[in-house]
Amino acid sequence: MRAYVITIGNEILKGRTINTNAAHIGRVLTYAGYDVIRMVVVPDEIDEIVWAFRDGLSRADLIVSTGGLGPTFDDKTVEALAKALNLELELNQEAFSMVKSKYDRLGVELTKERIKMAYMPKGAKPLPNPVGTAPGVYIEYAGKRILTLPGVPAEMEAILDEALPQLRVPGRYYYEESVVVRGIMESALAPVVNEVMRLNAGLVYVKSHPKGIEIDKPVVEVEVSASGSSEEEVRGRVKEAIRQLVSRAKSINPQCC
């Protein structure tokens, strides 16, 4: 199963806000059994957001967006989603109740800007926001699933956590483990990584992440990961690949790891 992540917001493109949401969503979806095939960032513009949703629908089974669900003029995600799916944008009564109850508790007026957060594509299901006010949106379309989340990290994480059980890919497990290799330059370790990949072709993925200075104080974290239908199986594959890697690295520098 493939997943596609969309981050919406001018502040991301300007570099004013670091895109931690995409990293969190990608991590969660990977452990939920998905292959995250693409992450895109688009501005707060209807046509750009429509393009992103349609591109995601053409490539993946699950599309997750973050950002653009609030009450301001530049929060355009649900409008763009409705347009992308050729669906009517309507006031969702369940979402309206969620939004109204939040503001009733605060004792503030339910303005048109606040009611805006209850509009959704026809047939969408609102997802409660335990942290903020804007509900998440879940909809199934043409055999694909779409989840839109707020841009505020705490709100995004809370709604995603609640939605995760219904999103998880059944019978699909992911496991990864890392080993830190010291005193071997990444360029010298590269043949070892290549050899371990060759020995485990199609079974594991091995990726080196340099943490030190290549020439002076080389430190390389090597990540080994695998996916499969059995948790025990993928764990075993990863551990065997790490054993192979450490054995070969020690032939270069016995004190490396």
From Swiss-Prot:
SMART domains: MoCF_biosynth. Disulfide bonds: none annotated. InterPro entries: CinA, CinA_Arc, MoaB/Mog-like_dom_sf, MoaB/Mog_dom. CDD domains: cinA (cd00885). It comes from the Archaea. Pfam families: MoCF_biosynth (PF00994). PANTHER family: NICOTINAMIDE-NUCLEOTIDE AMIDOHYDROLASE PNCC, NMN AMIDOHYDROLASE-LIKE PROTEIN YFAY. NCBIfam families: PRK01215.1 (NF002291). Belongs to the CinA family. This is Protein Cmaq_1209. It comes from Caldivirga maquilingensis (strain ATCC 700844 / DSM 13496 / JCM 10307 / IC-167).
